[in-house]
Amino acid sequence: MIRKVKKEIRVIGFDDGTFKFKSRGDKVILVGVIMKGSSDVVGIVTRWITIDGLDVTDAIIDAINSSRFKDLRVVLLKGITYAGFNIVDVSRVFKETGLPVIVVVRKKPDIGAMESALRKHFDDYEVRIKLLRSAGKLVELIPGKLYYQAIGISYDKAAEVIQVTSRNSMVPEALRLAHMIASAVMCGESKKD
């Protein structure tokens, strides 16, 4: 439990690399950047996940639990869908790592449209829709620009963590860097946040 959000709180932020939408079953990189607050990169972990698979949750849990970074305090996710519709079970990440999870998104997701796409394209759509719905309440942090969900941490503390770990953009620095690194691995150069 986090009582006070310190300026140099240790966080790990995950994002995936870019991919072609018609490449279901292929692999894409998942990058986790470990930081002290918003300034010091402490380390990086990587895993490969399946486009439109169901392995991102296991990859995140393994990356955290098998790493040498034992002083992590919070997991930051850039959304809950990775590699297409490879959806994170945020409750399971919280339970199996013992770390609170904060999901950060810049655009408010259209859950109805996502559920419709899942029903249309996936035989296991019920499992995926359940994961979407179990991610927690979406809260607006910066009106029209930044939203978040929190599991295992109060929404007030989660907002503090987001603010303390952000530096060069609205999103936490660990997520910004994870995005840049993952897209550079997949495309040869980083993509705009």
Curated annotation (Swiss-Prot):
Question: Which Pfam families would you find in this protein's record?
Answer: DUF99 (PF01949)
Superkingdom field? Archaea
Looking up Gene3D superfamilies in the UniProt record yields: archaeoglobus fulgidus dsm 4304 superfamily
**PANTHER family found in the cross-reference section:** UPF0215 PROTEIN MJ1150
Q: Which family does it belong to?
A: Belongs to the UPF0215 family.
How is this protein named in the record?
A: UPF0215 protein PH0071
- Species of provenance: Pyrococcus horikoshii (strain ATCC 700860 / DSM 12428 / JCM 9974 / NBRC 100139 / OT-3)
> Which classification does the entry list for the species?
Archaea, Methanobacteriati, Methanobacteriota, Thermococci, Thermococcales
